[in-house]
């Protein structure tokens, strides 16, 4: 409940400001120490049992050490940001306010607990850059720093020249000269000897060693995939992560919100043939938009009409399209139609070297190796006429929401979080604290200019750029797709304006290009937020020209993404300006609000090429964005609710695996035998009438000599149960003695393989259930409750199936080769790949169409 006139942000800032004053008072003591004394104190702090009682001293020490080793002195507002992160909250700090430095204090503090801490960022480049940049500070204070990158590459930060470093310690060198009094240390004023002595580099190490380091830098994807891979291993020692204690998520809005609809998936090839996808691609082309189906761009779904259903049945030669036996046909048809009408070349993906490569919708980067799951990627390949690769089968999956919820303490930092504070609170229980800027923000944010057509809009953008280029003012133009960035580039070339294009096709140089975007006369086109995390410093004389000008060519679905673009200008009190150029043909306005604006333009008799501009119109656009944000929030919440159900089951399966990996095979076998027997007693011996024939048939999965109930008499269910359990356990013990020591080792690999195969099959079934339960909303049933009931029933079936297979197979083993068993168990993991999933929620219209088919069975059953 919000209390009127109560500003919690102000209250928190006041609280943290008091702690900052204490830190500053403690700092004097540390600033008088020599380098060696400071190092010794840091070592002493590692021995204390509760660092929380020494937080002011620890932060003061890190502040002094940063000045000496990095030539950077954290401001008071940066100390506030560090305290916010240390309390497990989100610090909103504007671009250029030094978030990288802010993170060092809470990272060092929490690393003192000895459990390992993680700094999570959005790409490999930033992980390496920030670890190297802050590395001298951590190494000076006795911390090991690791970096994890894609393709299994891992590094440790080490001193470049150990001898020079040791001399710098004994000679008490500092990068920041004692007589330098300004708050920023200029490059020219740094002590060159100290700079050279405190240089670091990366050396390659194993993945496991990177996690053993006190502080580990890496991307959200790599941390998540390492967790999933750890739960596919066949030896406990092959696990690389050592737990989830404390993490700071850099660009937290990008990772926990923008990418929250994108589950991490480890998948492998399926048996579905390429010809199936080509067939459905051909059928999709015979279907007419708005007659056979409608396209809902808001929820990215295709809805078949009654005519479309009839036409599909004729084309597929089936009586009832929605009969359960035709589920896969519906699945393929909808995917083929989505590929044709919802996924656009050079916007959602590009075709390179006969391959479909996904474009990240938030950063504009290419994602080679990533594939849409559920057959969608293959449908796009069939549409584009490139070789169709096998459909992927899910081996392991987790959403970022549930991965990051595993951390005992989670914090985040970004320049834009306030607009999403409700979502952070509801989904992650994370509070947003807005940190004041070190210097006042003086950037001018102009009202939007709205044109009738995109052609008029782009012409106006080019004219604006030409005028600013003539006077030397740098311009950064933000676009929403590769296609649009290349269109603008062509127009600027015709106008004779030299410029740089920064998008998915050139991302290797993006940090270098974006860093130069503030130089005099620079014109840069950037796809969305490519180059995020890199500061744009103004060149000489640029401040007098008005600073960096940001031009947005389209409003994003989220106000936050627009604010990120604006935030590239006006860093640390620099001048700057921003403006968005829009048109009624832009996706956001076309889908959600063009009609109202069209009426306004007609009333005002706006001529072709003329824009309308008014603060009320800018607010109207923001209102449209709020509506879209609400829709997207609901989708993310729905995804999280579904994955939370899965999370309980995933934890249960992974706990089973860990139990078996740690050598508890015989204990697991005991449990499996008991479960195997109890289920049969419940089914065949419940009550006064026993179905002994049914029981005998169900026991036929065991070798004949294991158990016989023909000559036995039982007075109760308990007696029967005890007899069966004892008989099977005796057979297990005989088999152990017969085969010897290798038997349990062999069983370990066998059990893990059985668990993994069934879990993989279960995840595939859950994908179908997600679609199926949504059909039931018209039976006055809540899809979420139905999803829980359905998945719990399937999960219980899976556990029963696992135990039955284990119990029956373990007693049929004749000869054992545990090494061969391990190789066989691991063989399926060699072709695994990382998948970017397009998460689909069937909307009401589609469910209504499906519900018309009377032949749909009440229970959605997946063939096994």
Curated annotation (Swiss-Prot):
UniProt keyword terms in alphabetical order: ATP-binding, Cell inner membrane, Cell membrane, Cytoplasm, Membrane, Nucleotide-binding, Protein transport, Translocase, Translocation, Transport
UniProt keyword Lyase present: no
Organism (species): Pseudothermotoga lettingae (strain ATCC BAA-301 / DSM 14385 / NBRC 107922 / TMO) (Thermotoga lettingae)
Family: Belongs to the SecA family.
Name by which UniProt lists this protein: Protein translocase subunit SecA
Record's bilayer topology term: Peripheral membrane protein
NCBIfam families given in the database record: PRK09200.1 (NF006630)
Superkingdom per UniProt: Bacteria
Pfam families: P-loop_SecA, SecA_DEAD, SecA_PP_bind, SecA_SW
Cellular component aspect of the GO annotation: cell envelope Sec protein transport complex; cytosol; plasma membrane
InterPro entries linked: Helicase_ATP-bd, Helicase_C-like, P-loop_NTPase, SecA, SecA_CS, SecA_DEAD, SecA_motor_DEAD, SecA_preprotein_X-link_dom
């Amino acid at each position: 409940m919000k209390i009127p006139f109560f500003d919690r942000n102000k209250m928190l800032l006041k609280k943290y400001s008091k702690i900052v004053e204490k830190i500053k008072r403690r700092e004097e003591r540390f600033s008088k120490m020599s380098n060696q004394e400071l190092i010794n104190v840091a070592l002493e702090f590692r021995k204390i049992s509760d660092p929380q009682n020494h937080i002011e001293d620890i932060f003061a020490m890190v502040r002094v050490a940063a000045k000496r080793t990095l030539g950077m002195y954290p401001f008071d507002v940066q100390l506030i940001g560090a305290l916010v992160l240390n309390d497990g909250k989100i610090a909103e700090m504007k671009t250029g306010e030094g978030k990288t430095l802010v993170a060092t204090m809470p990272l060092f503090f929490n690393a003192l607990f000895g459990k390992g801490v993680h700094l999570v960022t959005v790409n490999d480049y930033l992980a390496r850059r920030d670890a190297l940049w802050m590395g001298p500070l951590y190494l000076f204070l006795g911390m090991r720093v690791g970096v994890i990158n894609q393709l299994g590459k891992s590094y440790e930060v080490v001193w470049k020249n150990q001898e020079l470093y040791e001399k710098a310690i004994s000679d008490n060198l500092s990068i920041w000269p004692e007589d330098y009094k300004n708050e920023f240390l200029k490059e020219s004023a740094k002590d060159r000897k100290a700079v050279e002595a405190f240089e670091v580099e990366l050396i390659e190490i194993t993945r496991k060693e990177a996690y053993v380091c006190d502080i580990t830098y890496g991307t959200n994807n790599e941390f998540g995939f390492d967790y999933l891979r750890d739960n596919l291993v066949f030896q406990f020692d092959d696990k690389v992560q050592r737990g989830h204690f404390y993490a700071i998520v850099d660009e937290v809005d990008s990772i926990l919100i923008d990418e929250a609809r994108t589950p991490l998936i480890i998948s492998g090839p399926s048996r579905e043939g390429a010809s199936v996808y080509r067939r459905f691609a051909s059928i999709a082309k015979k279907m007419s938009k708005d007659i056979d189906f409608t396209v809902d761009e808001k929820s990215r779904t295709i809805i078949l009409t009654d005519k479309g259903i009839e036409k599909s049945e004729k084309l597929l030669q089936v009586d009832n399209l929605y009969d359960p036996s035709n589920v896969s046909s519906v699945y393929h048809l909808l995917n083929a139609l989505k590929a044709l009408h919802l996924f656009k070349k050079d916007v959602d993906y590009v075709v390179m070297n006969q391959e479909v490569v996904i474009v990240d919708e938030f950063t504009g980067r290419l994602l080679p190796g990533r594939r849409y799951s559920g057959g969608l990627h293959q449908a796009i390949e069939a549409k584009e006429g490139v070789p169709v690769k096998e459909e992927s089968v899910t081996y392991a999956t987790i959403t970022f929401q549930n991965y990051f919820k595993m951390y005992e303490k989670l914090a985040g930092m970004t320049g834009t979080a306030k607009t999403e504070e409700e979502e952070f609170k509801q989904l992650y229980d994370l509070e947003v604290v807005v940190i004041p800027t070190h210097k006042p923000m003086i950037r001018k944010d102009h009202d939007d200019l709205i044109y009738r057509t995109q052609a008029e809009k782009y012409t106006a953008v080019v004219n604006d750029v030409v005028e600013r280029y003539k006077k030397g003012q740098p311009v950064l133009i933000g676009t929403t797709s590769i296609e649009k960035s290349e269109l603008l580039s062509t127009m600027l070339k015709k106008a004779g304006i030299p410029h740089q294009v920064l998008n998915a096709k050139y991302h290797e140089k993006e940090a270098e290009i974006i860093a130069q975007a503030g130089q005099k006369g620079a014109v840069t086109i950037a796809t969305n937020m490519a180059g995020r995390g890199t500061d744009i410093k103004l060149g000489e004389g640029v401040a007098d020209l008005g600073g960096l000008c940001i031009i947005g060519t389209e409003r994003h679905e989220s106000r936050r993404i627009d604010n990120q673009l604006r935030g590239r200008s006006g860093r640390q009190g620099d001048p700057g300006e921003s403006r968005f150029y829009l048109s009624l043909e832009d996706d956001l306005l076309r889908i959600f609000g063009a009609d109202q604006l069209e009426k306004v333009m007609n009333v005002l008799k706006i001529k072709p090429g003329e824009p309308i501009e008014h603060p009320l119109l800018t607010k109207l656009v923001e209102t449209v964005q709020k509506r879209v944000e609400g829709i997207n929030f609901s989708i993310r919440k729905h995804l999280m609710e579904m994955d939370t159900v899965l999370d309980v089951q995933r934890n249960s399966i992974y706990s089973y695996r860990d139990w078996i990996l740690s050598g508890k095979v015989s204990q697991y076998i005991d449990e499996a035998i008991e479960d195997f027997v109890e289920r049969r007693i419940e089914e065949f011996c419940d009550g006064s009438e026993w179905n002994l024939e049914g029981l005998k048939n169900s026991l036929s999965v065991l070798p004949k000599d294991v158990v016989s109930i023909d000559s036995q008499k039982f007075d109760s269910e308990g007696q029967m149960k005890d007899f069966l359990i004892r008989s099977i356990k005796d057979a297990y013990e005989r088999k152990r003695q017969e085969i010897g020591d290798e038997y349990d080792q062999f069983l370990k690999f066998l059990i893990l393989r059985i668990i993994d195969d069934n879990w993989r099959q279960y995840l595939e079934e859950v994908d179908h259930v997600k679609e199926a339960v949504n059909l039931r909303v018209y039976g006055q049933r809540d899809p979420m409750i139905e999803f829980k009931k359905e998945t719990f029933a399937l999960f219980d079936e899976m556990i029963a199936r696992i135990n039955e297979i284990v119990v029956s197979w373990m007693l049929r083993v004749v000869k054992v080769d545990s090494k061969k068993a391990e190789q066989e168990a691991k063989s399926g993991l060699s072709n695994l790949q990382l998948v970017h999933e397009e998460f689909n929620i069937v909307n009401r219209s589609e469910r209504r169409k499906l519900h018309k088919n009377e032949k749909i069975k009440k229970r959605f059953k997946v063939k096994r």
